[in-house]
Amino acid sequence: GDSPTEPTTSGTSGASLPATDDTGMSDTLPKFDVLDTGDVITTGAPDMGCKKVDFLFVIDNSASMEDNQAALIASFPGFIDTIEQTLSASNDYQIMVVDTDDDGRCKKPCDTNSSDYTDFCAIVKPNACNAKLDACDTTRGAGVVHPVGLYSSNVVCPITGGNRYMLPAEPDLQSTFACVARVGTAGNPSERPMNGMTEALSSTINAPGGCNAGFLRDDAILVITFISDDPNYEDKGTPQEWYDAVLASKQGNKDAIVVAGLIPQPAMGCADNGDPGAPKGSHWAEFIAMWGDHGLSGSVCEADYSPFFTQAVAIIDDACDNFVPPG
């Protein structure tokens, strides 16, 4: 989707918002283990309740995504604040951002005679084609650390701890997220968020020594948020194959997974490029629907993603309530 889309003002669809008390806080907090001393009455089922959350954001970095990335970054502070207020697991979360390609327009060696070089790489300071990138920086599915090209941060983002993902101890989490999530618009025009997602969750990239080593934890729930405005079907594979890959990454535990997608919504006038043959997000909608109550579909064209993330927190809260850690 390299054609800009006009924001709409219609609301997102999905799960109901959580019930709140007089303070405005959710009254459906997650359940946590209580030691069984014989006569003590426990709250919730034994061994239920998440204590860890791994957040994966998959962000389209193609030419039409500048405003969408800005909306996502603007919604993040409210989202993470609500997570920290709602989930007791908020003291042990990890946040990773990946983009949708491995060979954007500023991939070396740059062709200095091409319009891509002029329009997406040389225009930024410093020239994106001179960026010193390591192997993980050019691997699809690896956590973003150094966005390059037009409208990107164009710097090495200051993630504390040497990982390609952020922890709660990040000194300025909101600023660091804004840095990595501003992946820019110099990505390959073939947008493949599903492939970025499945590769980010692969056993190889998460193994010791891998680009994302330590990110994917067996005893955490996995929350995937992906965003793309592409009306076409560029991803390799099928919704069933993407579903199977994500499920396998959590050892078949569907209850440990939440999937939220900001995608084209033709019924809302969003990302309709006039091509009657284009799926316009239907393949992604099918994938999201496979997760049942743990799936949420929203419109990428909304100017404000806050209502979408409010709905997402309610779903994450429910997943946290019912999660049974392995072992």
Residue ranges: model-predicted function:
Residues M25, L29-G327:
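Divalent cation-coordinating acidic motifs and surrounding scaffolds
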Residues G1-D2:
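Bacterial signal peptide processing site
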Residues T9, S13, T20-T23, T37:
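Long, acidic low-complexity intrinsically disordered regions
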